[in-house]
């Protein structure tokens, strides 16, 4: 599919004005903008949570390795 040309955009705009009236269009645009902003914010929040969980798992693995290394080192010293 291709994007509408300039004339097609004008026809679409005219239909929107006829359907909603000139006074409602700024309100609709404002609501649409807020909706898009909220969506983007939620997407960023989900990405942050995912990164945090991944980091926590990496730290947990590193801690397990450190504990095992210390246990092995203590066993070597005792022997």
UniProtKB/Swiss-Prot annotation:
<dbReference type="GO" id="GO:0043953">
    <property type="term" value="P:protein transport by the Tat complex"/>
</dbReference>
<keyword id="KW-0811">Translocation</keyword>
<dbReference type="GO" id="GO:0033281">
    <property type="term" value="C:TAT protein transport complex"/>
</dbReference>
<comment type="similarity">
    <text>Belongs to the TatA/E family.</text>
</comment>
<keyword id="KW-0813">Transport</keyword>
<feature type="transmembrane region" description="Helical">
    <location>
        <begin position="1"/>
        <end position="21"/>
    </location>
</feature>
<dbReference type="GO" id="GO:0008320">
    <property type="term" value="F:protein transmembrane transporter activity"/>
</dbReference>
<keyword id="KW-0997">Cell inner membrane</keyword>
<protein>
    <recommendedName>
        <fullName>Sec-independent protein translocase protein TatA</fullName>
    </recommendedName>
</protein>
<keyword id="KW-1003">Cell membrane</keyword>
<comment type="subunit">
    <text>The Tat system comprises two distinct complexes: a TatABC complex, containing multiple copies of TatA, TatB and TatC subunits, and a separate TatA complex, containing only TatA subunits. Substrates initially bind to the TatABC complex, which probably triggers association of the separate TatA complex to form the active translocon.</text>
</comment>
<keyword id="KW-0472">Membrane</keyword>
<dbReference type="Pfam" id="PF02416">
    <property type="entry name" value="TatA_B_E"/>
</dbReference>
<keyword id="KW-0653">Protein transport</keyword>
<dbReference type="InterPro" id="IPR006312">
    <property type="entry name" value="TatA/E"/>
</dbReference>
<keyword id="KW-1133">Transmembrane helix</keyword>
<dbReference type="InterPro" id="IPR003369">
    <property type="entry name" value="TatA/B/E"/>
</dbReference>
<comment type="function">
    <text>Part of the twin-arginine translocation (Tat) system that transports large folded proteins containing a characteristic twin-arginine motif in their signal peptide across membranes. TatA could form the protein-conducting channel of the Tat system.</text>
</comment>
<keyword id="KW-0812">Transmembrane</keyword>
